[in-house]
Amino acid sequence: MTEFESAPAYQEAKYLTSAAEFDQLPPDQGAEIAFIGRSNAGKSSALNIITGIKGLARTSKTPGRTQMINFFALNEHERLVDLPGYGYAKVPRMVQKRWEELVDSYLKKRRCLKGLVVVMDIRHPLKEMDEDVIEWAVNYDIPIHILLTKSDKLSQNAAKKTLGEVQTAISAYGEKLTLQLFSSHDRTGLDEVKAVLSQWFRSEP
């Protein structure tokens, strides 16, 4: 058994470092899975629930709080990465442009990146920036898994309807994109997303 074959111990996650510039990233070794999404889509809450560590990724009622790339080590070789939230209107355009350049460089150049989790509020899916991020990742041949978060905010039928609509919208991208319902409140989809992450971590370099 290789060091990547067993499922990671997500509850062992520990804050590693933060980077505001590409040259501040930790060594491009091992395996990383990154989380990205619009401000207040539930990205930090998803990371906290997946690891079972309350407050691991800081949550805030003020969108746009995460302005750096934050790294969390699961072990010596595997990391979860919290990318800056986007789409917050009060962030100056210069800051937004710097964010776009940093994230684009990360997705394009980070060789240890195994997959990208795109977090979307199920009530407001596939906004323009969501689609831009998906386009970036597809162009760089990065596997994508979409979390439609806050599914508890909709009825079961409404959530399934939105799931189907988003599935239809992304079908042109083929098998590179998968998606699911998720709720940090009632833990809907927790086992499913963990299975996806573990599969990515076990994939060949």
From Swiss-Prot:
Pfam families in the record? MMR_HSR1
- Name assigned to this protein: Probable GTP-binding protein EngB
| SUPFAM superfamilies in the cross-refs | P-loop containing nucleoside triphosphate hydrolases
Q: Write down the HAMAP family for this protein, in alphabetical order.
A: GTPase_EngB
Instruction: Give residue ranges for domain EngB-type G.
Output: 29-203
State the GO CC annotations: cytosol
Organism, as annotated = Coxiella burnetii (strain Dugway 5J108-111)
Which residues of this UniProt protein bind GTP? 37-44, 64-68, 82-85, 149-152, 182-184
Q: Where does Mg(2+) bind?
A: S44, T66
Instruction: Identify the InterPro entries for this entry.
Output: G_ENGB_dom (IPR030393), GTP-bd (IPR006073), GTP-bd_ribosome_bio_YsxC (IPR019987), P-loop_NTPase (IPR027417)
